[in-house]
Regions:
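Transmembrane alpha-helices and adjacent helix-loop boundaries
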Residues: 1-219
Length: 219
């Protein structure tokens, strides 16, 4: 192990890690928004939109992120829509992640007993109040494990961003291996930085799950 090489290129990996984290978090934020909207449409069985959401989820979950990125990065400019690599990365992650988040949120919503909704309506609550105060708090706490797993999954999926020339962690490792043939050192740094990004999320997710399990409605 060449520690001099590792120390020399540590700042390069740090810069790549910030890029990976920035694009990853932006993509995840949009994925959460898309997922919540889609799960709500499915939960309330909105005509037409429900079918569109179902098609989107199947399309997103059954095609690789790399293919989706290539379509956005190379396909959209052919249709006159100009974009850049970072925007494509965010859009691709949001498109893929939205379907996974939708399924996670939907499972949480469907876990709530219908009697709770009926009881809320009988107390004079409208649909918004029922969702805001009765259904959503329980559904969110139930969805925590799947939500955290999806966040980690999506951050790991950022490793394909190098295919569209984004200088992320994977791009940096491949670049250094190609230039200096320092495979062990380059991959060691890659693993270390992915652990730095992902381990805190995993630990915080476990703590959050224990703290909010069923939001006090169950063990």
């Amino acid at each position: 192990m060449n520690w001099e090489f590792i120390l020399k290129y540590l700042p390069m990996y740090e810069k790549a890690a910030w890029l990976t984290l920035r694009i990853g978090l932006l993509g995840i934020v949009f994925a959460i928004i898309v997922g919540f909207v889609c799960s709500t449409i499915q939960y309330y069985k909105v005509p037409v939109l429900r079918q569109i959401v179902a098609v989107y989820i199947e399309l997103s979950r059954n095609t690789p992120l790399l293919v989706q990125l290539f379509f956005i990065y190379y396909g959209l400019p052919k249709m006159g829509i100009q974009t850049n690599a970072e925007a494509c990365g965010v859009a691709g992650l949001a498109f893929l992640g939205g379907s996974y988040m939708a399924e996670a949120f939907r499972s949480g919503l469907e876990a709530i007993e219908p009697i709770q909704t009926e009881s809320a309506y009988s107390l004079g609550m409208n649909r918004y109040q029922t969702m805001r105060y009765i259904i959503l708090p329980q559904a969110m706490s139930i969805s925590v494990p799947a939500f955290v797993a999806n966040v980690i999954f999506l951050l790991k999926e950022t490793s394909v961003f190098s295919a569209i020339s984004l200088m992320d962690l994977m791009f940096t490792a491949k670049d250094l291996i190609g230039l200096y043939y320092k495979t062990t050192e380059s991959l060691f740094l890659l693993v270390v930085f992915y652990l730095i990004l992902l381990l805190p999320i995993s630990i915080l997710g476990s703590l959050l799950e224990r703290r909010l399990r069923y939001a006090g409605f169950g063990a």
